Amino acid sequence: MQKFKSVEELVIQLRPEKPVYCIRKNSILSASTFFQNKFPGKILYAVKTNPHEEVIKTLLKSGIDQFDVASIKEIKGVRKFSRTAKCSYMHTVKSRESIKEAYFKYDIKTFALDTKDELMKIIESTNNAKDLELFVRVAVSNEHAE
């Protein structure tokens, strides 16, 4: 990955004709550290927001060690750099194969669901595992919301 001191330097050197993808690792580190110092709860980074490996590595370096993943590809992206980071499989509709792979190959214990069918799929695909952490999404009426 090429490094530049500024966007201006990048533009002068590359003279790009198409958009250029830039990752500002120091900004990621700074924002992550600030948020961790101010937020008292657990932080899960949603990998789908930016799954680039440099972003994942930078977040891990900053101390973020929990990730909201929505696919096996995202799990692999985190596991490439950390075997111990907690990945929570938060996509509410998953294939039986991806549940099995997540649980048995990547040691994922946390899953989201919003239907009984998805619950049964998770239970069956993990062979009735007793170490699951399940997040159930509940739809509530918003008829009185303002």
Describe each model-derived feature in a short phrase.
Residues 133-139:
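ATP-grasp fold ATP-binding core
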Residues 1-110, 116-132:
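A charged N-terminal "starter" segment
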